[in-house]
Amino acid sequence: MAGSIVFVTDNQISANSRHKPRFRRRRGACESCKRRKVRCNGTNPCNQCQKSSIECLYSSSSWKANDGDTERGPSGSPVQHTRGSLTPPQTSPYGGMACNGSAEESSRFDGSDAHSLLMSLSNTDCTTNTEATEMSQWQNWFVSDLPLGSDVQLTGTSDESLTDWLDPQLVNPADTAAIMQTLSGEDLFKSSGPSYGMSEPPSRDSDPGFNTARNEQIAGFIQKLRSQRPFVLRDENPEAPPGNIRGFYDAKFISQCFDACDADPEGVRVLLERKSMDLIADEITKYALAVDTETSVLFHSLMAIGCHSLNLDQGHRAIGKGKYPASKFFKEALNARQHLRDSPSLGGLQAILTMAYFSARVGDDSTSSFLADAAFCVQTLQLHNAGAIEQKYNSFLEQQVAKRALWFLYSLEKPRCLAQGLLPLIHDDFVDYDPPPSANYSTSEVDWFAINARFARICSSIIKERLGCKLGRTPSRRGKDRASEYSASSVIKRLESLLEEWRDDLPFAGDFDATRSDEFAASTCAERRHRIKCLNKYWSAIIATHSGQARGVAEDGGAGVRLSRARCIDAAQAILQNSHYVTSTDILSDISLYYYITVATRVIMTVVIRDRFASDITGDPVQKNTATRKRETTHGRSIMSYVGIAIGLFSRLSLDIDVPVDEVTELGKLGR
């Protein structure tokens, strides 16, 4: 027998029914799930292995998988499939979104917590103009600009992807030299022989330091670290969602959820006034389904945000046992999404932005399509600048609402485009005016709306410079002179000065030099989470600023290249230093904290592996054993200690959420 047989009831039938319950037979858990100690649905491949993109292994193949179950993920939600190719979407003249499925099809999820969205919301067959054209535009630029030859295959995004510096861009994966050259950020062959370009790789037999299988394995590990989203590990006995969701529409619970929305100083409270939210609550409690579509979508989105925050309150619930139906509320909002696109309005724009904020907060891939919907509404309403807004709306209050909505969209889009390497939709000319005060601004409080708007401006400047190819070249480009390096260094200096000014104006700017555990211990969970987010936001922007020049070739002194690499390493170390105080609940509350950690981990792992491979090529056993371990950092630790910090962090997080701990561990082993 291949394993224990588990009988699973398809439908719950009352005891007085004459019909017997139907059972279907499933095999036991696969070996991968047993080793990882996660719940397996017994299919081949199972839901956990599909989600984690690992091989699904069973002790025997005598049984055949149930074809009806292989396409199902946790909580009965369809598993997201990776698109094999990109097809041109049917976009509007405004560069909006083409949606090939209904809102109902895109919202089939039954999970009791908001993190089922990570699997189910992404099944919407929608693509933005940015997402659909990003690959082809970057590839065309990359091929035309570099003398790579006609046989080069591009299987990833552009070489100039904004946060993928030093990661292995799979350019002609069979070419081991090309993979390692891109991974290291420098020409590793220079010290051991003649210089080779990416289109002219050396023979694999000539250099025993390169192993094709090993290099492709490294590329897979880093790709997994870059792409995997953290999922909640389901409890064996999860709480069942409430059967009657109407019980959550009473005024007391609505007020509790809205209070949870207000708790985030950078959340929807900067977009919506509390009195407006209370008016929406009154309409819902009095008229229920008689309210207009914009009000209904906005209300259900706010309730989803509030339930999500309440479920993650460490004082009430355990991770994976959500009491409040965040997903059901958001499903109600999704059902009317198409109407908001068909009939754009200022209220509809606010509703879409609220949905986009929630999607970005839980880390769903549909965030880009929500932002595209918002950009489509902005274009349709012709909110192109301050003059257009003032001409369209006579009331000063409406003008402020429109300007605030456009700045909120700008503040959401620019950092995301910088992080994901996307092409932005909102031009800077759309916000040719200073951001208005926060919707709930008080002179006794910090206006985080203005702070985030300022940071978005800096992100936009970094994106412009990167898109203009002014921040460095790839290792294969030849003939860089000192003038180009000087120009890149001057641009970097200007951008970093803007970041430093932004950092110094933060309320807790003095905590950037060192992380003091006593201050984190004395603060609340929300304060600690917010402070760490601001710290890591600054350091990740430093990495993005220096990453282009860090990939350059350290020739003719290469002072600028070495400085950029050192700054990237320092920033990654600072992020990992702060990770001591990041919990699984923090990550599930705001997915950006996980993104900062993965960026820092990729930087540290790549530096360590680059040094290890450089030692292999030179054939110096002394350098191989001591070079990496003895490299001291600005924090007084060897860089290998930060590899240990990363492995320990992912191991700790893996107790509650599904993170690529095995891949991080293997990368650490390769760097030793």
Curated annotation (Swiss-Prot):
Pfam families named in the record: Zn_clus (PF00172)
Induction profile: Expression is controlled by the global regulators for secondary metabolite VE1 and LAE1. Expression is increased under histone deacetylase (HDAC)-inhibiting conditions.
GO cellular component terms attached to this protein's record: nucleus
Regions crossing the membrane: none
GO term, biological process aspect, one: positive regulation of fumonisin biosynthetic process
Primary location class: nucleus
Gene3D superfamilies: Zn(2)-C6 fungal-type DNA-binding domain
CDD domains, per database record: fungal_TF_MHR, GAL4
Region ranges (Disordered): 65-111, 190-212
Superkingdom of origin: Eukaryota
Keywords from the named record: DNA-binding, Metal-binding, Nucleus, Transcription, Transcription regulation
InterPro entries associated with the record: AtrR-like, Zn2-C6_fun-type_DNA-bd_sf, Zn2Cys6_DnaBD
Knockout consequences: Impairs the production of fumonisins. Abolishes expression of FUM8 and FUM19 but expression of FUM17 and FUM18 can still be induced.
GO molecular function, one term: DNA-binding transcription factor activity, RNA polymerase II-specific
Subcellular localization: Nucleus
Residue ranges, compositional bias (Polar residues): 77-93
DNA-binding region: 30-56
Role noted for this protein: Transcription factor that regulates the expression of the gene cluster that mediates the biosynthesis of fumonisins B1 (FB1), B2 (FB2), B3 (FB3), and B4 (FB4), which are carcinogenic mycotoxins.
Protein name from the UniProt record: Fumonisin cluster-specific transcription factor FUM21
Organism in which the protein naturally occurs: Gibberella moniliformis (strain M3125 / FGSC 7600)
